[in-house]
């Protein structure tokens, strides 16, 4: 420390030198010292350093002054508080100095100090004291109005301080407001402007009283309307306040908007511009409160969008031949200058109107149909705008409209969406000709910016409406070529033109482009050869698509591609051979050449084998190998049967080696490539090549990656079909892995189907030691030997399905094996595991093969219904249902008879019936529907809920067989006197709804409202199942319920409330325990709300929705967890609405995070509380992603509470890490 002090005193001495270079060097060295974390200054050194730095601020040399100011930053954090106060005092005094240079340098110094203070959320006393000290001096400097330059600096610093530390100055807010308000009438516009900025920062942290005073002052001054100049200022101020604190100004809009509307009619362009800008900020920041005024705002914007008093567009408006009239463009360009007028401010009004319409379109999704009637035609008619900046904003507004129209969820554009009448998409479709007509002239404009806007517009249009431009390609192609050939155009314009062409090529049928190929190929080929890599890369994408256009392989085409092949091949091979090009260009050149060989390979002659050799080289390169594998897969699948023999000998072993690389995408790509090679080139592959691949397969067949396993099994299936002689190699480790995977509980879905296909293909190859009985023993052996216990029930199902697959492939083996399984079930010495497997296998075999010849089968299965093992009983129930599907006339009447005569076995027999209804064909079941229906209705009033649920599922699935007859019958039971019957039919409806189109959908749409009326049922349980059914509809087929939301939501929200009358106390021994019978229904209601966020957001009043989310944040553990998830979704989906409610949301989150569990609680309680805290923190992290959320005083206070609590800080940090790593994973293109 002594040496540091000595070094610093040495520097201080040099700073007094008369030589400016000495002073500069010494100050620079001091700066370096102060930036070191290790530096510690004693009191004396601190005092001397501060004194010297302040002295150097008045140095004659400007460079020394600048360095001294920079030293203030690190110095503030290294010296004691009273020294910081000395610095601030001196700087404030110097700010009022007569010397201009000293004033300037001192104000920079103050900004530096303020910038270095710890944020308000840290709760630092230093920050608070310094800010208070500065505030008093600044307010007096601002209020004096003596020297404008001092005022401007003071206002600047005040704004800076309020934005960083506003929360610490709450006591000063009234005096700050008092000093700022008079400045709004300053004769200097610069002073007014900075005052508005300062007020904008003030309203983010000030208390309500100050905020009300400010708004009342502005409203009163606006009502007086003393002078046009101050009125403009007040409107600007209101807009600024709305931008910074929209959630606070909302309640005053009823008073503000009529005033602003009135001022729009005053003949003052500047005032109009500010009024429309104010509307824009209201629309973006006060979505709920502005809603009643949106139509008024749209009308004003539409009026002023065309406001151009100094220019006459008439000659262009009705040009019927505009599509062909390219010649007249230059004359129009020349006329601009005659009308151009330096005093003409009308363009600013038009720009404000376009931006405000953009805001309306972006925030009011529910008004889309209305926008297409009014806003869309108006914007299209303004694409001809003469002022470039305005035109760009008009285009941007239309882009926003298109983006809002793009279907976010697939059901929006599904044919089964069943929304009648004009939809936004059909309205857009009808306006496409007008859009193209308006864009056509703009695409030949000199302005690069305009042409870029046109390309962005066309790209978005085609993304929203694929195929929309089919009729208009002849008009658009010349415009695209114009930009590609334009020598003066920028790289970005060419990239946009190419990217637009690519999207158009991808989304229209090839025939549309055939007349234009001759014109398109030369400019695209030229772009492939462009020296700028980004243009080349984009052009290669277009070339690849052009290849598919000139010779589509998936449809007949009479187009002659021959004249273009040489040019396309030559430009691509040049890029493929080049070694020193950009990575993306390398990859796209490989993909493009792959497409050329796939579609045109039969025309390449000797070039083909040379090109394939280059592919072989690229396969050996780590950077290009994955792209090359994909290209080879494409070529190998080509119907042209490309000759790959020259590269297979060397290529297949390389591909085999990729299977052991630690790169998942490469493994998957390679398995696809090998699969297609085996299918199409088996006669060119040698046994050695295939053995090399088989050696690599065992590690890939594992439950740790089911997708890779599935691909590997599919490859083996292909091998069994086309190259059966190679299978003798698999009996060792590959088969062990396969059998191991069959026993895995994770084997389901696609991987299980692949496994079944494989066993069926394998068993018919006649390979030694891999016959039917061999494979059967391998699959079932462990169950019989009891050597390895199969812990998971799913494993038995998988083995049984494999047994059935083998038996279907070898039907002659069936009777003996079925007989054996029947004996296994009968045998009293069989373990439960053996019985379980035997029953499931009988079920799976019987599903596909008629087992009615096995006379004792029925009695054996019914006997198993009496087993003490629940799993055996369940398997017997499944087996009976599954066997019945194999021969309905034999088994279904038997099952129905048993249900009637065996009340004790009813539950199991109903499960058998459910299996029959779920799996049998509609035609097969039709004759039995009436009998089954009558039987089910007898049991739908059963008091046992489990039985009722099975009955409901059967009723629902049966209804799908004959919806026209059965759905009205179901509806009839809604008036049943039994609440059990009502809950059964409402649950049944849930099983008629699926996520794909079905014949029942239109019928269901007409009557689902009747079923949902049970949300008003007096019985709690009926209301709960109605919510579950509603949730299923909202999730799987939202179009069923979208139009009913206005009537359903009040009842849904009603069920989110805690009901005191449903809470009761139960005595458990010496303890009293509270039971809430309403919890389940509240949970169901909140689950519906969560689903609606994804499927019907545009139909929700989000503020009403948030009211109930707020209640949920204070509810039971399960509901809190759901509402935390909702907050995370809401932060992304409607951030501005959440921001308005932020202060009300923070409190319950804070309460959850700071709740302590009683020390004597059980471990579960601690775990639950911990999970609650983590979920609440996730919600906080999501809220903080909303721009300006951290500016809320309550939120910043909560943040400082989190950072000062080690436990909460640790949780918060880990959640932020998790979310950033999730984002990185989602970016992983593999």
Curated annotation (Swiss-Prot):
GO terms classed as biological process: cell differentiation; negative regulation of catalytic activity; positive regulation of DNA-templated transcription; positive regulation of RNA polymerase II transcription preinitiation complex assembly; protein ubiquitination; SCF complex assembly
InterPro entries reported in the protein's UniProt record: ARM-like (IPR011989), ARM-type_fold (IPR016024), CAND1/CAND2 (IPR039852), TATA-bd_TIP120 (IPR013932)
The HEAT repeat ranges on this chain: 2-39, 44-81, 83-119, 131-165, 171-208, 210-247, 248-282, 289-366, 370-407, 424-467, 471-510, 515-552, 563-602, 606-643, 646-683, 688-725, 729-768, 770-808, 809-845, 852-889, 890-927, 928-960, 961-998, 1002-1039, 1043-1097, 1099-1133, 1140-1189
Keywords assigned by UniProt, alphabetized: Acetylation, Cytoplasm, Nucleus, Phosphoprotein, Repeat, Transcription, Transcription regulation, Ubl conjugation pathway
Modified residues (N-acetylalanine): 2
Principal place of residence: cytoplasm
Residues with the N6-acetyllysine modification: 55, 971
Subcellular location: Cytoplasm; Nucleus
Pfam families: HEAT_EZ (PF13513), TIP120 (PF08623)
Molecular function terms from GO: TBP-class protein binding
Modified residues (Phosphoserine): 335, 558
Region annotation (Disordered) ranges: 315-344
Domain of life from the UniProt record: Eukaryota
Gene3D superfamilies attached to this UniProt entry: Leucine-rich Repeat Variant
One Gene Ontology cellular component annotation held by this UniProt entry: nucleus
Tissue-level expression: Detected in heart, brain, spleen, liver, skeletal muscle, kidney and testis.
Family: Belongs to the CAND family.
Function: Key assembly factor of SCF (SKP1-CUL1-F-box protein) E3 ubiquitin ligase complexes that promotes the exchange of the substrate-recognition F-box subunit in SCF complexes, thereby playing a key role in the cellular repertoire of SCF complexes. Acts as a F-box protein exchange factor. The exchange activity of CAND1 is coupled with cycles of neddylation conjugation: in the deneddylated state, cullin-binding CAND1 binds CUL1-RBX1, increasing dissociation of the SCF complex and promoting exchange of the F-box protein.
Complexes and interactors: Interacts with TBP. Part of a complex that contains CUL1 and RBX1. Interacts with unneddylated cullins: interacts with CUL1, CUL2, CUL3, CUL4A, CUL4B and CUL5. Does not bind neddylated CUL1. Interaction with cullins is abolished in presence of COMMD1, which antagonizes with CAND1 for interacting with cullins. Interacts with ERCC6. Interacts with DCUN1D1, DCUN1D2, DCUN1D3, DCUN1D4 and DCUN1D5; these interactions are bridged by cullins and strongly inhibits the neddylation of cullins.
Protein name, as recorded: Cullin-associated NEDD8-dissociated protein 1
